[in-house]
Amino acid sequence: MLSDIEIARSAKLKKIDLIANELDIPEEYYNLYGKNIAKVSHKYLNELNFKNDGNLVMVTAITPTPAGEGKTTTSISLSMALNKIHKRSIVTLREPSLGPVMGIKGGAAGGGYSQVLPMEDINLHFTGDIHAVTSAHNLISAILDDYIKYNKYDIDSTQVSWPRTMDMNDRALREIIVALGGKKNGYPRQDGFIITAASEIMAILCLIENLEDLKKKLSNIVVAKNKKGEPVTVKDLEITGALSVLLKDAINPNLVQTIENTPAFVHGGPFANIAHGTNSILATKLALKLSDYVVTETGFGSDLGGEKFYDFVSPTFGLKPSATVLVATIRALKYHGGQNLKDLNTPNLESLEKGLPNLQVHVENLKKYNIPVVVSLNKFYSDTDEEINMVKDYCDKLGVEVSVNEGFEKGSEGAIDLAEKVVKVSEQQSELKSIYDFKDPLEVKIEKLAKNIYRASKVEYSSEALSTIKFLKKYGYENLPVIVAKTQYSISDDPKKLGFPKDYTFTIRDFELSAGAGFIVALAGDILRMPGLSKVPNAVNMDIDNEGNISGLS
């Protein structure tokens, strides 16, 4: 089979203005970035209020292996298949972060015959959205150190909670000292870098509906404490306007297309293990007005991106999901059954059977939201008929629809059965039921998530967490929704607890306030916001020839 980049180059793309015209987007509401990319103005959403929303399909996954299980590929193939069965469909995805592209993951625009294109541009600099977020984020950092030097706002230099950022994996920058070299360089203090996808500004970009909303959320960001222990906000720094200027174009969704010319919005990129893990709400809302079905991907497993989509994003913006697609793979289930990571392509019914409870816990958890679930078994070349039949039989016992997806090798043709089943269950018109209410006390929200989703028997808080709770309550933040930051490799807070762990203690070690984005981050376990490169990073495989053809980006 051809490589992803070879398949992408062989695709016959339509000019993006033709895709926009097919969606009935007037020319004055989009700007072209070359022949194959356009930015659609957020203002166009105001012109669509008279239209009903289409069906919203959320794609999530079981607990993944380190390599991922193909949610993006599944989302793209499903959207293309819906179009093939004459349902107008748009897929909405997050933008790839450059760090993981150069690191262990490689490209993140789908794979095989289910890709969004132009994949080289999407995986690299794209339309500059991530650069804009990086610039805005670092402006805050620069202003903070400037104000500390000149003693404005009485900022406590030991209580600065706003790190610097860059869109690259670089572990050496996790903990640094800034302002060395004498008085002229400022006041020395401990600092660090996070990857841009982990920035609160990235989360805000994906949670705003217009410029007014952007300015309000930016103003509310808490960046430090003063020497009285009071929060210092961006509004206090008087740079809301400057930040908004830097982000004015980045807030507009990016329109591209799939390998089969299905429209795709690729916009924003917050991680799901430390933020809400979904593409921009502007992209989703635009897509809902322009199509019969919107397929949206959420990050990592259903205990992370899926949970946050149903407990935070959907209630906040009044979204009404019609179906859930749960991506599973035989190799991931064998991994949860104890099979070694390097042997996952070796058939093993015993390991598969032992790993099936991981599928069970995700199905059970998703059913609690009252949205119908379809399991999409993402087929790999190494899967045997016996293994596939074992998963099908198990899904029957769980009372859930299952479809074998071959979108990677066959494009839309490999996902027709999945599309038909999604349409069928969407007709049920179910109403979302979230796990917690926004009005619940912070500790109650966390307990409901821990027991219903993470399957813990109790929750414990460190002394640091208890101290932060007092701060949150004192300054009126306790009623914000909660985003649990935890490992993606287990439904628990311990990456070593594979399968279906239960009856354990879920530990919250501290909280971080994302007042601008509108949520509290509960930290469970050790979560790195600045990844490191792997021993052999994907960057060493990349090259470009004298004709400008890129290799190794897949």
From Swiss-Prot:
UniProt pathway annotation: One-carbon metabolism; tetrahydrofolate interconversion
Gene3D superfamilies, per the entry: Domain 2, N(10)-formyltetrahydrofolate synthetase, Formyltetrahydrofolate synthetase, domain 3, P-loop containing nucleotide triphosphate hydrolases
Keywords: ATP-binding, Ligase, Nucleotide-binding, One-carbon metabolism
GO molecular function, one term: ATP binding
Listed CDD domains: FTHFS
Record InterPro entries: Formate_THF_ligase, Formate_THF_ligase_CS, P-loop_NTPase
Residues the entry annotates as binding ATP: 65-72
Pfam families, sorted: FTHFS
Gene Ontology terms: biological process: tetrahydrofolate interconversion
The keyword Ribosomal protein is annotated on this UniProt entry: no
EC number: 6.3.4.3
Superkingdom of this protein's organism: Bacteria
Keyword Iron recorded: no
Catalytic reaction equation(s): (6S)-5,6,7,8-tetrahydrofolate + formate + ATP = (6R)-10-formyltetrahydrofolate + ADP + phosphate
Family assignment from sequence similarity: Belongs to the formate--tetrahydrofolate ligase family.
The protein's name: Formate--tetrahydrofolate ligase
Organism: Petrotoga mobilis (strain DSM 10674 / SJ95)
Lineage, opening ranks: Bacteria, Thermotogati, Thermotogota, Thermotogae, Petrotogales
